[in-house]
């Protein structure tokens, strides 16, 4: 198996300027099979008919469904679509990737974090940006250095991770331990995430496999 065999679906804003689309774009650029789902051109994203999305067909046979938590702030329809995609995707055997970043209005972090917590058991890879780590640290009243480990232990998420471009360092908390890896290249956080999820399906789930995926 190689990256060209990895299938990734992302859902997000039709303007294609959100984190889900960025991950999608990075995955596509390194050779994964990708598809982006959004509303029709003549629809408003906030109110589009999300029932028209055939999630069973769209998620059948894929490895990952990528969402950005900020999407739920864009209207009732996007929020419902995120939830439906996760539910049907899980039934079809897809694994969920959730990106958490600080919204344009920082006060909304509590809203998106509440949504993530409500869906935490459906998420397989939870990626938290450096900015969001600080915000969640304040919300949860725990040290920044403990956020990833605490969230993984509370929610039993298989992979909780972050990447610092300045430090060129990836941090991953997983079911049997934790890994801190320095990358040779100075890359963007979502590019690191894309490389990680593209390698993870065939790198293995143990420490060696996860470290290998971290350095993809």
Language-model segments: what does each one mean?
Residues 1-216:
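Ribokinase/PfkB-type carbohydrate-kinase core domain
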């Amino acid at each position: 198996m190689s990256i060209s065999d990895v299938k990734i679906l992302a859902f997000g804003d039709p303007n294609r300027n959100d984190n889900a689309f960025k991950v999608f774009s990075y995955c596509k650029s390194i050779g994964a099979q990708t598809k982006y789902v959004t509303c029709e051109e003549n629809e408003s994203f906030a109110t589009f008919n999300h029932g028209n999305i055939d999630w069973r067909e769209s998620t059948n046979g894929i490895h990952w469904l990528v969402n950005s938590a900020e999407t739920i702030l864009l209207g009732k329809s996007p929020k419902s679509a995120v939830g439906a995609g996760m539910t049907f995707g899980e039934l079809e055997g897809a694994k969920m990737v959730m990106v958490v970043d600080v919204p344009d209005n920082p006060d909304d972090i509590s809203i998106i974090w509440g949504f993530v917590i409500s869906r935490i058991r459906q998420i397989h890879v939870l990626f938290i940006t450096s900015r969001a780590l600080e915000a969640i640290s304040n919300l949860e009243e725990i040290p920044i250095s403990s956020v990833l480990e605490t969230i993984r232990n509370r929610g039993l998420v298989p992979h909780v991770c972050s990447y610092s471009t300045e430090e060129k360092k990836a941090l991953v908390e997983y079911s049997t331990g934790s890994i801190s890896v320095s990358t040779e290249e100075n890359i963007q956080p979502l590019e690191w995430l894309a490389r990680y999820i593209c390698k993870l399906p065939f790198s293995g789930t143990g420490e060696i496999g996860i470290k290998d995926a971290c350095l993809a």
